[in-house]
Amino acid sequence: MEWSMLIQSPTDWGILFLSALIIGMSKTGIQGLSLISVPLLALAFGAKPSTGLILPILCIADLIAVLYYRRIAEWKYVFKLLPAALVGFILALLVDKVIPPAAFKHLMGGCLAIVLLVMFWSEWKGKENKLSSCWWYGPFFGLLGGFTTMIGNAAGPVMAIYLLSVKMPKYSFVGTNAWFFLVINYLKIPVQMFAWNNITSQSLIIDALTIPFILCLLYTSPS
């Protein structure tokens, strides 16, 4: 993929740098913020190509967040979510295999719509949410998170809703979220590189230019 053909104008660069800034801020626990970057990049560079462009940015932000909060994760929740998330991950790959390429943008749009519905549901239920004690609650959010992260890198709000619903403290929330996505996002790299051909040496150079904007998470971290 020739990324030089996709990023040609100051507007394209502006969208890329703004998205990196948003992603960096989202890693500090600002619920739903990362959803803004997904449609921005998809509209600018195309639905499927944008997933390969955004993934290294997410991986850099995840690594910084883990280095910053590495000692305060609640691992029992990471281990509870990961198996179902991997099932969702594989399910997303199977769905991608059977749909025509032109339908990917609709699938991504559907994932974003589902995430928004879950966010609205969470706000509506508020403190009255009694489902978090059900046995299927964690696996459901893991499955949904795995599917939506593979298709649209849109699982941030899904995980935020789950971790907040189990009454996780602020610092533990950020640390647990960071470790979960570090594992999931780094697992996605081989798929993007070798199956979807969305990550190239050229795209990685472009992503490297966004690092100063990602570093904003160090200044917006909760204190």
Regions found by a protein language model. Give the residues of each.
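Transmembrane helix exit motif
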Residues: D62-I72, L107-S133
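Small-residue-rich hydrophobic segments that form or flank transmembrane alpha-helices
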Residues: W13-F79, F141, G156-L218
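Conserved small/polar residues in nucleotide/adenosyl-binding loops
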Residues: Y219-S223
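Alpha-helical transmembrane segments of integral membrane proteins
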Residues: P10, G14, G52, A103-G110, ...
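Small-residue-enriched transmembrane helix starts and helix-helix packing motifs
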Residues: E2-M25, S132-G146
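Small-residue-rich segments of transmembrane alpha-helices in multi-pass membrane proteins
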Residues: L43-A47, A84-I90, V115, Y137-T148, ...
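Membrane-interface helix termini and inter-helical loops of multi-pass transporters
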Residues: E2-M5, L94-A102, M193-L204
